[in-house]
Design a protein with these regions (language model features):
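A short secondary-structure junction signal
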Residues: 143-144, 192-194
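C-terminal active-site subregion of NodB/CE4 polysaccharide deacetylases
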Residues: 2-107, 113-114, 193-287
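Active-site beta->alpha N-cap acidic-glycine motif
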Residues: 51-69, 82, 86-180, 187, ...
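Short beta-strand and adjacent tight-turn residues that come in two discontinuous sequence segments
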Residues: 133, 184, 249-251
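Short, flexible active-site loops
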Residues: 184-192
Length: 287
């Protein structure tokens, strides 16, 4: 199959295999070794060994070759708890009340086009309201295979296909389907590299753009890259998020959220749609 359209422009990436086409030759071996290790670590673990929590599984993409596995993952998780929106999850944490049961709140980072084409139909079919954190400067963008930002900021390893992002029309369509559009900054930057004033502008300008274009409140923020004190400053940027009018800040820390936990320190579990049940069982049973 050709990697370019009739006009010579690289066609959009459609599969995870295309997204990772330039992985080194030993990448499959590393993935196999990791899978074997996780199978061993998952022995005896159960997602429902504990209760009274909210977990925040998050993804970046659902490409064509990931759709079936993504649907299978959601159906698997539905056997252990209830899916709730980030608005409801944060309201529960804000209340300080008891969390009675097990809840999953799904989100996606970066705003790739596959959120619309791959994830949305599967989520909507199941009545799941997911959050999508978008980079507002990337709305409507298409990055070439050799684009430095595509590789540096979004982990793109495509060979002959481009990386396509959501448009504002896409975001409005998703919002009409019950999805929630959150901010992943104006640009995909490490807030830790910025002064407080510049960081505040990233939060406030992206929030304003989303509210203007989508016509709904943008109440949730997720710093790019996600690791506190490395990629952003938890105290400083949490304070900036509160002052800007956000209700939550999502991190890349793994683990469950429980009664009394701070919605400006949301822990989330990164997943890939193609992973098997043993991988979900391991990561979603961690404290």
């Amino acid at each position: 199959m050709s990697g370019a359209s009739a006009g010579g422009t690289p066609r959009p990436t459609a599969t995870y295999a295309e997204f990772t086409a330039l992985d080194p030759w030993h990448a499959p071996l590393r993935a196999l070794a990791r899978d074997v290790a996780l199978r061993a670590l998952a022995v005896g673990r159960r997602i429902d060994d504990t209760s009274d929590w909210i977990r925040f599984p998050y993804y970046h993409h659902v490409f064509d070759d990931e759709r079936t596995a993504f649907a299978r993952q959601l159906d698997y998780l539905a056997g252990f708890g209830e899916f709730i929106s980030i608005d409801d999850a944060v309201a529960l944490l804000e209340s300080g009340g008891a969390i009675d049961g097990r809840y999953f709140c799904i989100s996606f980072d970066d705003g790739l086009k596959s959120c619309l084409t791959g994830a949305l139909p599967i989520l909507a079919e199941r009545g799941i309201a997911a959050a999508f954190y978008v980079v507002t400067a990337m709305i409507g963008a298409t990055l070439a295979p050799d684009d430095a930002a595509a590789r540096r900021d979004f982990g793109f390893r495509g060979r002959r296909t481009s990386l396509e992002f959501l448009t504002w029309d896409d975001c409005r369509t998703m919002a009409r389907k019950g999805m929630i559009i959150g901010s992943h900054c104006r640009a995909h930057v490490r807030l830790a590299d910025l002064g407080a004033g510049t960081a505040m502008a990233e939060l406030s300008e992206s929030k304003a753009a989303i509210e203007r274009e989508v016509g709904a409140e943008c109440g949730h923020f997720c710093p790019p890259y996600g690791i506190p004190e490395k990629d952003f400053f938890l105290e400083r940027d949490g304070t900036l998020a509160r002052e800007t009018g956000y209700r939550s800040l999502a991190t890349g820390w793994r683990g469950a959220m429980r009664q009394g936990d701070d919605p400006f320190r949301l822990r989330r579990d990164h997943l890939i749609a193609g992973w098997g049940k043993h991988q979900l069982r391991y990561f979603l049973s961690l404290p």
